[in-house]
Amino acid sequence: MEIQHYDNDGRGRWFIEADGETLGEMTYFWNSPEVFTIDHTEVGEKLKGTGCGKKLVRAAVDYARQHSLKIRPTCPFAKSVLSAEEFADVLA
């Protein structure tokens, strides 16, 4: 399954779809041109326990690193994943 990214008008999401059904998503909004806040992560029953939630967070980290951005996580799940030392460089 491929993680897709959509950004529009100050908000966006990374998501996983199959057969037109959203199976997991992580949403965010822009605080400034350099910082975005991850405010929600959700994985459907079909993907629970598969690591897809962490893959969504990693997609955001990859995006932040590629574009020299910072992440402010308010979603408890994203906050937990991003507390690892390996992600310190992208935290706002």
Q: Can you say where each PLM-predicted feature lies in the sequence?
A:
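Conserved acetyl-CoA binding element of GNAT-fold acetyltransferases
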Residues: 35-45
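Conserved active-site alpha-helix within GNAT-family acetyltransferase domains
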Residues: 65, 69, 76-92
